[in-house]
């Protein structure tokens, strides 16, 4: 785990693909929070005991930028921001099967069991044979939002075992081991200063290789 930034209030990390954010049934060890609490013991009492410092999440297979709270005040502030979505900026890079018909566009529709509104903007950055590199910017933070919307575009994420196309995955030269989705940029208002801060993490090698 690479720490991108750390101060008295927050710690920002580049989450590796395959790491769980917090312990869960069947995954009691090896989480990011376990490592963070070892490095910053004060985080053990921030938020809930099961999810210390956690104010948002990424899927286990998704890599990229995450912020954790180091104090209870920062935790409450950031939780409020992530729940309202108004001050949060999120950008992702993904490798898709095929490419959307339009170079850029927006999907605005319900996702998930509760059919909550989800707004996703996309822009095609590059096309490489049977796949494309697409930047997603989301205004909401619904579970599997990008993965669902990409599938609705007819261009599921490469390596997505839930919403993807296993037959197409098998025909690719890269043999994906995970869904190729990376949280490349995260911005929010710093819980103490109130200033907008932005953090970025370069895409990992498997994503780069897929569109090289």
Write out the residue ranges for each language-model feature.
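RNA pseudouridine synthases
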Residues: 1-212
């Amino acid at each position: 785990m690479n720490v991108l930034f750390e101060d008295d209030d927050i710690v920002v990390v580049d989450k590796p693909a395959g790491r769980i954010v917090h312990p869960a049934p069947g995954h009691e060890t090896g989480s990011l929070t376990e490592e963070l609490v070892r490095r910053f013991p004060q985080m053990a009492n921030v938020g809930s005991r099961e999810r210390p410092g956690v104010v948002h999440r990424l899927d286990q297979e998704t890599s990229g930028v995450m912020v954790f709270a180091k104090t209870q005040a920062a935790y409450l502030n950031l939780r409020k921001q992530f729940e309202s979505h108004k001050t949060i900026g999120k950008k992702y890079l993904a490798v898709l099967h095929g490419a959307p018909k339009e170079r850029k566009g927006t999907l605005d529709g319900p996702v998930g069991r509760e059919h909550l509104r989800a707004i996703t903007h996309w822009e095609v950055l590059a096309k490489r044979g049977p796949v494309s590199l697409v930047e997603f910017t989301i205004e909401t933070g619904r579970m599997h939002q990008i993965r669902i919307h990409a599938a609705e575009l007819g261009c599921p994420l490469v390596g997505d075992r839930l919403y993807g196309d296993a037959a197409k995955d098998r025909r690719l030269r890269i043999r994906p081991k995970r869904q190729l989705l990376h949280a490349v940029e995260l911005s929010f208002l710093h819980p103490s200063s109130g200033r907008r801060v932005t953090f970025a993490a370069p895409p990992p090698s498997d994503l780069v290789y897929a569109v090289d």
